[in-house]
Every structure is written in C-alpha cells, then in structure tokens.
C-alpha cells in the first residue's frame, strides 16, 4: 500500500473538526479559578525559533558537504527565502496563539455554539438534534478560520513567494482556488463528521472502537479516491509522454520491484514554481505523479492552458507560461528515488500502522475523558456536553502536547 503524500490542504476528518487555536483556558466555578495550560513542544517554542533563525542568519557560505552540488548564488537565495519564511512563521504563529487565547477568554466557543443552535432552530431542528447544530457550528468555525487566515495566506503568496520568484498565481486565481478548496472540504467534512457523531451517539460502551474503525475506513477511502477524483478538481493531470525520462523511471521502479502502472505530470506551475513528486495507490496499482515544474523544458501543460482548452478565464491563468524550468533527468530520478525509498524501506506501512495505533489510543482516551463534566465547564459548557465540543476539547486542547510529540516522531521517522 502507499499513502498519498500530498492532500492539497484536505486534512484527516478527525483532525479538521475544528482549529481555533491553542492557548490558556480559564473558568470560574464555586469561586475557584481553574487554569488549564496547554503545553507546547520544544519545536514550537521561541527558543527553537531563535536557534533556527540564527543558523539562517549566520550560515552565509555554502557548507562543504554541499560544495560540489550547490553554487553560492543558489545557496544565498535559499538562505534569504528561509529567513523570510521563518519570520512569517513566527508572526503568523503568534497571531494564532493570541487569537486562540482571545477566543477562549471571551467565551467564543460557547457563543458560537449558541449561535449555531439558533440557526439550526430557525431551520426547523429542535435542540435535541445535536448533530444538526454541530454541523452548523463546524461550518461557521471553519469559515471563521478561513477568513481570519486569509490575510496571512495572501501575504505569504503575494509578498514572500512573489519576492523570491515562486508565486505564479494571479489574485483572481487565488480566490477562486480558495473558494473551491473550502467548498470541497465542506462536502467531505460535514458528512463525515455527522456520521462520526452518530456512531459515537449510538455506539454504547464500545463506541470508541466503532469510531476508530469508521475513521480508518474514511481515511483509506480518501487516500484511494483523492488522486483520481479530488485532485483533478484543482489541477490538470496528463500521462508523462514516452521518452528517456519515462523509461528511466520504469527501470528504477522495476529494479526495486515497485508495481508501477502509470506516470502522470500535474500542472503545479499555475500556482508556484516549487516542485515535488509523489506516488499513491494500493497493492499492485501504484502511480507516480511529477510536478511539471520538476521537469526541464517541459511545457505541454502550460501550452494547453494558454490555448484556453480548460475553459478558465484570464484571471485564473498562471502568470508565466512555457518557461524553461526544472531538473535534468538524473536529478528527477534522484528526487523520485527518495520517495520510492520510503516504499522500499516499508516506511509507508509502518506509518499507517503507527498512525492507526495512535488513532485508536486517542479514541480510547476520549471515551475515558468524555464523561468528565469539569472539562466542558472549563470551556464554558456548564449545562450541556455536546459530543463535537468534547471531541474538540480533548483532541485539540487536552491532547495538544501529545499530538506535538507524535507529529515530531512521525517527521523524524519519515526522514
């Protein structure tokens, strides 16, 4: 099996239930004040950021390990780009923390829940229809997150990426793409969430097992259909033409017994000049996808796009067409060899197993903690204990330190 390496912004159904920030939470009860401090891992601490930034600032010469493969100009461009990205990461992260803190301190979560109840009530759903209210809450919360994150996304795309020559989007294309992503995400997220909440409601004492199995099935289905049905909504995929590169890729795959069936090229150049490669598929039906920006002199997709065959207007077209770009065949094979190495060494299977073990543990602990009314009261829910809010509190806040550490382990494992 192979898990999809890139999801175009679509997250795991459980993880994207709600993202409102991580911060301190305060509550008052019997004249006592309880404080729940969400602990962050060292990876998100200012000390780590300062250490990383110091490396970017002081390493002004090409390290000897890279001297044979990278010139000074390329290294300097990369260093300055990472400096700007580091600064952006700090300020956007700080804003996220402040936003999350204000939401918690001002009672934003119970307020939005009450507003969601009013909206669902006007739609004809009584208070006992908790799932309907939960879906309204989720829609409003993700809309709020998208709107508040928009200025940061715009700055990242049209200031930082533009400054360093990576951005290929127009403003019109950016907004159309963002709206499309939001709609597609809601079409997946809302039905999946409603079914998950229903399973938890009727699952009895062993609901955590059924919920875990459900999310496992959903994850596998999304991995299966993403590249064939979801990704084409955003990007154009065409088979890699016959030639030396395709033959070399097929030979590489054969040499490690990789069951390759097709090789595609995706039009990544309409968004960015960054390049990438990944593979997907289950069992004996695996496919490789190369970004067109990875391939030297490859411009078939850009040419078709400029001729208007995809029906998009001028505002949505990328700004640079038929530009010489990418890597030589040997370099493409090196990039692809890294990805195939994950498969050959069993990283994909190991990652899936570890991920599902982690998911099961989280649902089990959720089953243990969901009955604690004090958790709900700490977030302003004194009379009701909605299942969606419980999922958000436990997965987003209580498990925050655990999630940070396991994410770090996953990254280290894949590297």
Role assignments for model-derived ranges:
Residues 2-18, 31-387, 397, 401-415:
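Polar-ligand-bearing catalytic/cofactor-coordination segments
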